[in-house]
């Protein structure tokens, strides 16, 4: 394998190992393959990947229900960490040799990955590259849907469904670090305990308790100001039941289905807002603005220890299928990562 060298003398091979989706299907369709190392375009960096985070959208892409946006790599993986080894034209904020963690448009399950320079962030102080790889996708998602679209304001209370998921553990810690009351739902006593250890004021076991009634009780009848919901389906009318007047429901996934029956009179009378978003199709400029907001508002909180990494298990790149099996089982608490080694 011939290696090319950039101007700063970091050798980059022509070929790399990647995980391909051989056909739409279950975890078994993920296969190790060889591909050409991508070249950074203007405004992009090439990262030698140390680790890649594993997320639900990766599983959806593998199953054939969440196609990459036009121009994005068909290799799964939306967040990585590693070392910058090549720069596209116009990149000035990073230099070759810098360590970064980054949101990617795809291609993270690989030894090398390109991404816009503005989507990179420095690994937090004291965090390993594997730990840093699990930050971008969930932190971008929470920032957009809780703090921007959900408009979580000082004094507001947040309810997070799926509190023990990667999104959940990020939302708990981000909101608590900024001084908010946080309630969550989770499906076992172990998961509820883990959420409370991370800062949730109360974790509600949705298998044994009515979360809507419990949230109303915990807030003296007021309800939550913002709800982050990745379940959808029949959770939505229950969400509205425990939203405060002028409350905001932010939908980010539909693990419980895409259809719900609502009492729209309740929406009007109590001035409720229902919003939602997906991250991957958003523009480079939008994601860069989110990265800048995270670096300004959240990174200082991480650096002083108010937010900590929560990794349940790591796998090698060759065992990506096992990582997908685990995340789809719902047994994990926190994040799952692939250690690539770059």
Regions found by a protein language model. Name each.
Residues 5-16, 299, 304-313, 321-342:
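C-terminal capping/lid region of NAD(P)-dependent oxidoreductase domains
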Residues 178, 234-307, 332, 339-342:
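Glycine-rich phosphate-binding loop and adjacent beta-alpha segment
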Residues 36-54, 65-107:
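Glycine-rich beta-strand-centered segment in the early N-terminal region that forms part
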Residues 211-221:
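Short amphipathic alpha-helix with an adjacent loop that forms part of the alpha/beta core around
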Residues 104-117:
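A structural motif shared across PLP-dependent enzymes of the aminotransferase-like
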Residues 95, 125-128, 151-157, 221-222:
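Short helix-loop-beta connector
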Residues 133-209:
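Mid-domain Rossmann-like dinucleotide-binding core that forms the NAD(H)/NADP(H) cofactor-binding site
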Residues 108-111, 186-194, 211, 259-264:
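Short, glycine/polar-rich helix-capping loops at beta-to-alpha or helix-loop-helix junctions
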